[in-house]
Structure formats: C-alpha cells, structure tokens
Amino acid sequence: MYKRQIQDIEKILDENNQELAFEPIDFGYMINGQSNKGTIGGYVACNFAGSRRFKVGSVRDHILGFKGVNGKGDIIKSGGTVVKNVTGYDLSKLISGSFGTLVVLTEITLKVSPKKQSQITVIVYSDEIKKISNLFDKILSSSNEVSAATFIPEEPNHKNYEHTKNKIFKFNDLDHEGSFLAFRIEGDKRSIDERLKELKIELDLSNFKSSILDVHQSIPFWKKVNNLELF
C-alpha cells in the first residue's frame, strides 16, 4: 500500500464516499502540467498537505500507525488500525516529514473522512492587504467552519501566472479584477447556505465586490490552488 499511487487511493475512496481529509497536493502539475504520480509513502515522508491544513492538520495528524525498517535493519511498528487512546511515543508524527531518513515505510494506516456532500467558494476582490488580513483573522476565528482560504495576488509582470488565473475565471464565467481572497465552505447544502448567510454578516462582505463558485466550479479551483498552479 505504501507504494500505491495517491490518485488510485483517492479514486477508491471516492467510490466509497470517503476522502483523505488533508487534501493531497501534486507538484507535477506546476512543473510539467501532469501528475507526478506520487505514492502514499512519499506523502507521509514529506508531510505535504493541501488547503484544509489550517483546519484539519497535515498528513501526520491522520496517521493511525505504520510499519517500517530502520537503518539497523530493525522492524519498527507504531500505532494501530483504529482511533483510541494509546501510551508511549507517537512515532507517526516523528517519521512524517522526515523525508525517509529515519525509516523505510512498508505499511501505513491512515484515517479517512466521509466525503463532503457539496461545497462553494466565495471570491472577495481587494488589493488592500490590510483589509484582506483582517478578513483572514475573522475567518480563522469564525465558528462557521471555513475549510480553506487563500489569497491570490495580482502579478501583472508574470504573464504565465496571470494567463493561468484568467483561464480559471473564464471557465467559471466570472469577471476577474486584480487580487482576491478565496474561501471555501463545505457540507450539505442547507448547512452551506446558513453558514454563508452568517459569514456575509460576520465578514461585512457587503463592503466588497464578491462572487461565488458553485460546487462544479469550486472543485477544480481548489485543485489548482493545492497543486500550486495559481502561484
């Protein structure tokens, strides 16, 4: 399983209405426009995670256990296959992000989450960093469970960057002006509608130009954000 490509695992989970909550990222699209076909072992070794990280943590926060071999040839086992209280050292957090220097992974057990029923993304247009920063602070402290947020600055001197960004908005049939903040709300439709209503008041969105990406627009947008195609 540690050699299994992450895209294959995501496909299997999707067929069962589940997902990896930490949102795997794929740097291959940024470099050559196609997947780098990373393995689950590679993701754990590098501890890479996508846009939900500030809410659900990184890969290391979703490892239940692992088996591996250290530099002396000793077999190492840590954790288990279920979520429960345990004692001793949490080696899973130690090996995550160690880039394979501590142990060669042979088996990994990860937590998975129910797949979110739907999502929307709110785009807030502004070139004023102070205002954007204040919005970020409010989003982070909000009880309305924003699952992702990012700031995309305008870069007029970087034509490829602006071209990629404009393609996203052309696909979404939206006008694009300057820099913008994007944040995502996930869950069932009723919950999304209620939280959006509260966030509009909480963030004073009436003072900003804004637009909304529906679920079919939001999913590819965050794929490109997670894969660093918009940066």
Predicted regions and their residues:
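Short, basic, low-complexity termini and linkers enriched in Ser/Thr/Gly/Pro
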Residues: 1-2, 210
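FAD-binding glycine-rich core of flavoenzymes that anchor FAD
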Residues: 3-93
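C-terminal substrate-binding/cap subdomain adjacent to the FAD-binding core in PCMH-type
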Residues: 45, 64-230
